[in-house]
Amino acid sequence: MIIVTFFWVGIVLSAIWTFYKVVLYPYRVSPLRTLPQSQRGHWLWNHAFSEFLQPIGQLHAELLLQIPNDGMICLRGLFGAPKIFLTSPKSLADVLVHRADDFEKLPGERKILRAVVGDGLVTAEGDVHYQQKRKLLAGFTPPKIRALYPVFWKEATALTQQIRRTLTHDGSGIYTGTTDMVYWAPRVSMDMIGAAGFGQSFHSLRDADSEIIHCYEKAFAIGAGHLLCVFADTLLPRIILQWLPWPRWRQFRQNIDSIRDFCHQWVTDAKATTALGDGIPNNLLANMIHTGEYTFQELIEQVRTFLAAGHENTSSVVMWVMLALASDSQLQSRLRQELQANLPEVELDEVDLAILEQLPLLNAVVSEAIRLFPPLPIGNRIAIRDTTVMNHPIPKGTPFLIVPRAINRSSELWGPDADRFNADRWINPDTGRFNNHGGASSNYSFLSFFHGPHNCIGQNFARAELRTVVAAVIRSFDMVLDNPAADVSPVGWFTPRPADGVKVKLRSLV
């Protein structure tokens, strides 16, 4: 009888606690209850899975337009759990800069990233992150980046040469044909990060069967089934997964392990080269080894991180910028004129390629592509202690959504043409010079590289890569879309790409 009584008391207390946590606290007690709320969620799970809806970030861009707010919108998840969508420069500045120590990436997100891209700078938090970034910054100074332009240009030129080999020669010196830039973008970005990052020649452009490219294509595949593999690999014990009849997971795991093996070999090679004492090679890995501050395993994890970030992110933007240029013949012509005037064909090897940083339209095109198509369209943070955002109390454990795709396309921040590719927004009409704000009133309107202590350490590296690829391709070919009606909606869980690819008709120029 006593056991039965305790049982029913437990049931009643559990029901009361559940009612308080699910119904009473979120909507009647929580300090977040006064924030603007979205009513568009699913009847059962509300917005719990909003960050996975394709195109990623599009829903949040719509909510930003539809819900009046002062910088924060409260989205509800399972059982009414709050998730705060940051919508203004002021709220973003608080979370990313002013109170950055009060926020971290979600533990689950860090665990997934650690499994996929390594336990390096991207997954580090707190003092560990500070120390890692302090040591790495020396390899990303402007002089270091400028010294890499010849490396980038060599790979960008190799791209144009390999594309030309796939075209048809008409007998008059002109090559024409059709190609898909979605095929070439990951290959040129892989060869660039290989050479400039690790001193390795991957030859991904020349080798259609490049093993490292195939590993990455499969490890970062598009589709819900692949995403399930990532979650399972992160959340379930390996011993359980090994017993399951799940070939897709085994293939995913094999690709991740192969990438780690590649990184292990590159670090081994780089340490052997450095030990010869013939000077420090001009690449990121050699610089890290030269400091003497990294263990062998730490080097492997940082290489995994830079390989993923330097390859996937750049590859994504290359696809989108080629799509934008192929869609606008006038912009393409203007850019070509600028390049021809500043990069003469004769004795190009003797030109200081850092001049690319001074070309207004080239930099405008690159910045606009990064703005409109951020390689990381959405991110998460969680409050690790009670804090405030815009003077509003935030309880410990509150998750936040940071959505570059939505902020970068906000008409309130970027004007009525925020959704349109407009490179001229980055050029001052009175002087014709490049500006670094694109007409936005706050630098927090541009979120592609985030801000604060956790901003992207490789943003100038990525811009240099993009300048050289765009310059090399536009100097070499005239491009038009093969099918202007193709579906160019962004798809993908990690770095979005056009759904139907970027198929272009090419005509050689040089």
Swiss-Prot record:
<comment type="function">
    <text>Cytochrome P450 monooxygenase; part of the gene cluster that mediates the biosynthesis of the indole diterpenes penitrems. The geranylgeranyl diphosphate (GGPP) synthase ptmG catalyzes the first step in penitrem biosynthesis via conversion of farnesyl pyrophosphate and isopentyl pyrophosphate into geranylgeranyl pyrophosphate (GGPP). Condensation of indole-3-glycerol phosphate with GGPP by the prenyl transferase ptmC then forms 3-geranylgeranylindole (3-GGI).</text>
</comment>
<dbReference type="GO" id="GO:0004497">
    <property type="term" value="F:monooxygenase activity"/>
</dbReference>
<dbReference type="GO" id="GO:0005506">
    <property type="term" value="F:iron ion binding"/>
</dbReference>
<keyword id="KW-0349">Heme</keyword>
<feature type="transmembrane region" description="Helical">
    <location>
        <begin position="2"/>
        <end position="22"/>
    </location>
</feature>
<dbReference type="InterPro" id="IPR002403">
    <property type="entry name" value="Cyt_P450_E_grp-IV"/>
</dbReference>
<keyword id="KW-0325">Glycoprotein</keyword>
<keyword id="KW-0408">Iron</keyword>
<dbReference type="InterPro" id="IPR036396">
    <property type="entry name" value="Cyt_P450_sf"/>
</dbReference>
<keyword id="KW-0472">Membrane</keyword>
<keyword id="KW-0479">Metal-binding</keyword>
<dbReference type="Pfam" id="PF00067">
    <property type="entry name" value="p450"/>
</dbReference>
<protein>
    <recommendedName>
        <fullName>Cytochrome P450 monooxygenase ptmK</fullName>
        <ecNumber>1.-.-.-</ecNumber>
    </recommendedName>
</protein>
<comment type="pathway">
    <text>Secondary metabolite biosynthesis.</text>
</comment>
<feature type="binding site" description="axial binding residue">
    <location>
        <position position="456"/>
    </location>
    <ligand>
        <name>heme</name>
    </ligand>
</feature>
<dbReference type="InterPro" id="IPR001128">
    <property type="entry name" value="Cyt_P450"/>
</dbReference>
<keyword id="KW-0812">Transmembrane</keyword>
<dbReference type="GO" id="GO:0016705">
    <property type="term" value="F:oxidoreductase activity, acting on paired donors, with incorporation or reduction of molecular oxygen"/>
</dbReference>
<dbReference type="GO" id="GO:0043386">
    <property type="term" value="P:mycotoxin biosynthetic process"/>
</dbReference>
<keyword id="KW-1133">Transmembrane helix</keyword>
<keyword id="KW-0560">Oxidoreductase</keyword>
<dbReference type="InterPro" id="IPR050121">
    <property type="entry name" value="Cytochrome_P450_monoxygenase"/>
</dbReference>
<dbReference type="GO" id="GO:0020037">
    <property type="term" value="F:heme binding"/>
</dbReference>
<comment type="similarity">
    <text>Belongs to the cytochrome P450 family.</text>
</comment>
<feature type="glycosylation site" description="N-linked (GlcNAc...) asparagine">
    <location>
        <position position="408"/>
    </location>
</feature>
<dbReference type="GO" id="GO:0016020">
    <property type="term" value="C:membrane"/>
</dbReference>
<feature type="glycosylation site" description="N-linked (GlcNAc...) asparagine">
    <location>
        <position position="313"/>
    </location>
</feature>
<keyword id="KW-0503">Monooxygenase</keyword>
<feature type="glycosylation site" description="N-linked (GlcNAc...) asparagine">
    <location>
        <position position="443"/>
    </location>
</feature>
